[in-house]
Design a protein with these regions (language model features):
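Cyclophilin-like peptidyl-prolyl cis-trans isomerases
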Residues: 13-142
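Sec-dependent N-terminal signal peptides
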Residues: 4-14
């Protein structure tokens, strides 16, 4: 399968202001990804996955204190690509090496909730097993 690359030009987690730009959205915390293919707006489930959301937002804003020195003070996701694209299933990003094995230099535990992957636009952490979350995420297509 031909790999499609979509550059993440800017990822900004919007705590406020998203409702001004997108009045159709329910009140909440959103991530706004600006890509070469257009805008992707994702709702972040802060109440159900507070550690995961705090990690994602702090990486996006360049304020994560746990990152490896090379990423310190930088908006981690800016300029990264979706390195894994599976048609009719999902896109995966958040890896600075674009290989599927890179990360921010630390790992954190899983948060299990009643959230499911039952439709398009679901955002989840991508990992290599229990307790291996870092920066990689995927977004479902269907």
């Amino acid at each position: 399968m031909k790999k499609t690359t979509i550059f993440i030009l800017l990822l900004s987690a919007l705590i406020l202001g998203c409702s001004d730009q997108h009045p159709n959205l329910d009140k909440g915390l959103y991530a706004n990804l600006h890509t070469s293919k257009g805008e992707i707006i994702l709702r972040l489930e802060m109440e159900k996955t507070p550690v995961t959301v705090a990690n994602f937002v702090s990486l996006a804003e360049g304020e994560n204190k746990k990152v490896a020195e090379e990423f310190s003070g930088k908006k981690y996701y800016d300029g990264l690509i979706f390195h894994r694209v599976i048609n009719d299933f999902m896109i995966q990003g958040g890896d600075p090496t674009a290989t599927g094995s890179g990360g921010p230099g630390y790992k954190f535990g899983d948060e299990f909730t009643d959230l499911t992957h039952n439709g398009p636009g679901i955002l989840s952490m991508a990992n290599a097993g229990p307790g291996t979350n870092g920066s990689q995420f995927f977004i479902t297509h269907k």
